[in-house]
Regions:
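P-loop/Walker A NTP-binding region and its immediately flanking N-terminal helices
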Residues: 1-157
């Protein structure tokens, strides 16, 4: 028994780890790279499309690139080796919070996000919230999220 292998679903095992690995998203990558390079990031990004086009993957790559300590300045690729990149990849980064809105549809779930938004980042430069399947939120949960989307605290980014 040399090493215990950890099971990963295929979607996570082969999830792109660099912007160049995003197939069919060249224009999006160019726009995001320019925004990151010029330090002109929006406080929120809405990524839309059919299932499987890479919305969540893109949000995670943005988070990795923004908080990466050794980011390639030319093309904004995250290094994948710094503490921030490794912890984002392993879903243990305290500054990248991913919420599945399909399972957490209520106002209390969104209020938990709103409470976390006010805290400063721990490891990286930004605290990033990825709200997956946001269309599943209840109307009251959307209303609770609206003010935070309109006026987010400094150093916080929200991807929905």
């Amino acid at each position: 028994m040399t090493e215990e292998k950890k099971y990963k679903v295929l979607a996570r095992k082969y999830r792109p780890q660099k912007f160049e690995d995003l197939i069919g998203q060249e224009l999006l990558v160019k726009i995001l790279s320019n925004a990151i390079n010029n330090e002109r990031l929006a406080h929120a990004y809405i990524l839309t499309g059919v299932r499987g086009v890479g919305k969540t993957t893109t949000a995670r790559l943005i988070a990795m690139s923004i908080n990466c300590k050794n980011r390639d300045k030319k093309n904004c690729e995250p290094c994948g080796t710094c503490d921030s990149c490794k912890s984002t990849t392993s879903d243990s980064n305290l500054d990248v919070i991913e919420i599945d809105a399909a399972s957490n549809t209520g106002v209390d779930d969104i209020r938990e996000i709103i409470d976390n938004v006010k805290y400063k980042p721990v490891i990286g430069d930004y605290k990033i919230f990825i709200i997956d399947e946001v269309h599943m939120l209840s109307k009251s949960a959307f209303n609770a999220l609206l003010k935070t989307l309109e006026e987010p605290p400094e150093l916080s980014l929200i991807h929905i």
